[in-house]
A protein has these predicted regions:
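Extracytoplasmic
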Residues: 19-54, 72-75, 161, 239-244, ...
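Conserved MFS/SLC helix-loop-helix module at the cytosolic interface between two early adjacent transmembrane helices
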Residues: 70-108
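Helix-loop-helix hairpin linking two adjacent transmembrane segments in secondary transporters
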Residues: 149-197
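Cytoplasmic helix-loop-helix junction between adjacent transmembrane helices
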Residues: 115-151, 332, 338
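Interfacial helix-cap and linker-helix signal at transmembrane-aqueous boundaries
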Residues: 46-47, 78-79, 162-171, 247-248, ...
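Extracytoplasmic gate region of multi-pass secondary transporters
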Residues: 39-43, 220-273
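Hydrophobic core of transmembrane alpha-helices in multi-pass small-molecule transporters
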Residues: 29, 98, 109-125, 230, ...
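C-terminal transmembrane helical hairpin of 12-TM major facilitator-type secondary transporters
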Residues: 264-268, 281-332
């Protein structure tokens, strides 16, 4: 039997999902900006003020990401059944408390505990639950909605990094976190409470697929998908966070390297804008493998080339691939197994991916030190991404129609 996602039912006309999308765009910008992008801006000042080393601070931040990844599995299962409104509202409240905890932390231990609380909030307010909400409410129109959401999310660093830097001057890092906590409280708590007040469509109204989650989780195709995305996440995040030292080692000034990094962010926006065309033009397996191969190729070329213009161009191309990869990840479950258990399956899929992304900066730095150069480390990352692309061939289950919106209900393989 061939099954497809149907359009949202009568309980959720187009105005309802549109309001949800606008709400999530605003709250994602705010949540990412405060919970993720403010820390790199403030880390140096925190270290100088407290004497806590930057590596220790980074470890506390990474601990929050690990907690977010692990809790995402439980969050996804709950969201499938009950919807995102109360989950994301409570997550926003926890986020406010966590940021207040960061602002007032008297010791590094308390600072780490506050990041664990922030990680708990991240699991409930960042991309995975937002993706699940839009996938259920938008049905076959999900790709456009997800693209808009990730384009908005991409503005978080553009907006909040400079705001954080401006606030940190007169207010210090503690005062800055107090202001950011207030922003979270004013924007995200009422935003999720009021903006997500829509009837949650029952799973059977969204898809008629019969894949049991336990079958899918044990299937070869799902395990291959997890491995492929985790390897690609490790490679791509290692590239992002080690791009500046790579370029500097090749003779590029820090100022130009920073520009290249920023243009890579612009590349992500271009990649996301093009995903709708890609999803209509290529089947699931083809676009998965092509995107993962793109990570490998751009990483290898960054290791190979030395000219400034070529390196900047490659940084933009690598950013485009990362932008596409975000949406390939967001639609991976629905493209293969339908939308009924999207939250649970994506939660399990995202956990190792988030862990890999959290470890990537450390892995990249250690490899560069052991191997003696960032170029050699980039070659290793390119090889890792190539393995991910090869695994991509095995990520589509038997019986899947291998198209964007149609999934054939067969036992998971």
């Amino acid at each position: 039997m061939t099954v497809a996602d149907t359009a949202p039912g009568p309980a959720t006309d187009r105005r309802g999902p549109r309001r949800v999308l606008v709400t999530l765009c605003i709250t994602q910008i705010t949540s990412w900006g405060v919970l993720y992008y403010a820390f790199p801006v403030l880390a140096g000042q925190i270290s100088a003020d407290t004497g806590w080393s930057v590596p220790i601070l980074a470890a506390a931040f990474s601990a929050g990401l690990v907690v977010s990844a692990l809790l995402g599995i439980v969050v996804g299962r709950w969201l499938d059944r009950h919807g995102p409104r109360w989950l994301m509202t409570l997550g926003s409240v926890v986020a406010v408390v966590a940021v207040l905890g960061l602002a007032g932390a008297p010791t590094i231990g308390w600072f780490a505990v506050a990041w664990v609380a922030a990680g708990t909030a991240m699991s409930a307010v960042l991309y995975p639950p937002a993706f699940a909400a839009l996938t259920r409410w938008y049905g076959p129109r999900r790709v456009g909605a997800l693209t808009i959401l990730t384009l908005a999310g991409g503005l978080a660093s553009t907006i909040f990094a400079p705001i954080t830097a401006v606030l940190a001057g007169p207010l210090g890092w503690r005062g800055t976190y107090l202001v950011l906590a207030a922003v979270l409280a004013v924007v995200t708590v009422p935003g999720h409470l009021l903006g997500l007040n829509q009837k949650w469509p029952p799973a059977q109204h969204v898809t008629q697929e019969r894949h049991r989650p336990d079958q899918v989780l044990r299937s070869r195709s799902f395990l291959a998908l997890v491995a492929a995305f985790a390897l690609a996440a490790c490679a791509s995040y290692a590239v992002v966070l080690n791009l500046v030292p790579l370029l500097h080692q090749k003779g590029v000034t820090y100022e130009v390297a920073a520009v290249a990094l920023g243009l890579g962010g612009a590349g992500q926006v271009l990649g996301r804008l093009g995903y709708g065309w890609l999803s209509r033009s290529l089947r699931v397996r083809a676009r998965t493998c092509l995107t993962l191969a793109g990570v490998a190729v751009t990483t290898a070329l960054l290791a190979m080339f030395t000219g400034v213009a070529a390196l900047i161009t490659l940084a933009v191309l690598a950013g485009m691939v990362r932008g596409i990869l975000t949406l390939v990840h967001a639609t991976a479950v629905t493209d293969r197994w339908g939308a009924s258990h999207y939250g649970q399956l994506t939660g399990v899929l995202s956990a190792p991916v988030t862990l890999a992304a959290a470890m990537a900066p450390w892995i990249g730095a250690v490899l560069a030190a052991v191997l003696g150069s960032y170029s050699t480390m980039f070659w290793v990352m390119a090889g890792m991404a190539a393995v991910a692309a090869a695994l991509g061939l095995a990520t589509v289950p038997a019986g899947c129609a291998d198209s964007a919106d149609v999934v054939t209900a067969q036992p998971a393989q």
